[in-house]
């Protein structure tokens, strides 16, 4: 399964991702309150007020880690956790921590998260093509040419191996022929020497 198809299978889980992102922002806000030593906060659709030794009110809060939590998101998520609508919500730090813990537990046991786990398992089990998708025509032609070249090279190497070596000519047969040639008859030679002249 290629990367684009894997990404496409995640589209069914966008609502889960948005819920996780919203909850993450509220968790970050709670951590920032603890870091600052704030005792409580007051949230409306347009403002976040942190109440502590140094109270502050702003349309958004930027944590020491650079995370930004806007009032509209925090107000909406906190309203969902509280379970009722109100112009503003006031919670202390302990109550906010309890609300966040309950939200995390509900998310872990949700059908949406189980469905996401099934999708991950299906993606992991899908075969992958390390070479990537084949380009029509071009890749096929290149592969055919490469196979033909490899075949020709193998044929040439096999022919070179099977061709019998040409025997070297040796001087030995000449010597044999010289030794085997008829020699003058020694007796005839001696007879000629003993024949009296006329």
UniProtKB/Swiss-Prot annotation:
One of its GO terms (biological process) is cellular response to gamma radiation. Keywords: DNA damage, DNA repair, Stress response. Disulfide bonds: none annotated. It comes from the Bacteria. The keyword DNA repair applies. The keyword Ribonucleoprotein does not apply. Residues 124-198 are annotated as: Disordered. This is DNA damage response protein D. It comes from Deinococcus radiodurans (strain ATCC 13939 / DSM 20539 / JCM 16871 / CCUG 27074 / LMG 4051 / NBRC 15346 / NCIMB 9279 / VKM B-1422 / R1). The lineage of its organism: Bacteria, Thermotogati, Deinococcota, Deinococci, Deinococcales. The gene is ddrD.
């Amino acid at each position: 399964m290629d990367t684009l198809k894997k990404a496409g299978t995640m589209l069914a889980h966008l609502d889960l991702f948005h819920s996780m992102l919203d909850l993450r922002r509220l968790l970050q806000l709670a951590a920032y309150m603890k870091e600052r030593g704030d005792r409580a906060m007051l949230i409306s659709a347009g403002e976040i007020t942190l109440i502590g030794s140094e109270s502050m009110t702003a349309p958004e809060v930027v944590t020491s880690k650079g995370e930004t939590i806007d009032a509209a998101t925090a107000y909406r998520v906190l309203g969902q956790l509280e379970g009722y609508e109100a112009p503003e919500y006031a919670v202390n730090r302990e109550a906010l921590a309890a609300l966040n813990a309950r939200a995390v537990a509900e998310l872990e046991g949700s059908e949406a998260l189980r469905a996401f786990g099934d999708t991950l398992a299906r993606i992991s089990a899908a075969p992958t093509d390390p070479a990537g998708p084949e380009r029509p025509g071009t890749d096929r032609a290149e592969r055919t040419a490469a196979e033909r070249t490899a075949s020709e090279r193998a044929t040439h190497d096999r022919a070179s191996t099977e061709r019998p070596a040409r025997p070297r000519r040796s001087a030995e047969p000449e010597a044999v022929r010289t030794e085997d040639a008829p020699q003058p008859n020694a007796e005839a030679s001696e007879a000629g020497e003993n024949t009296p002249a006329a």
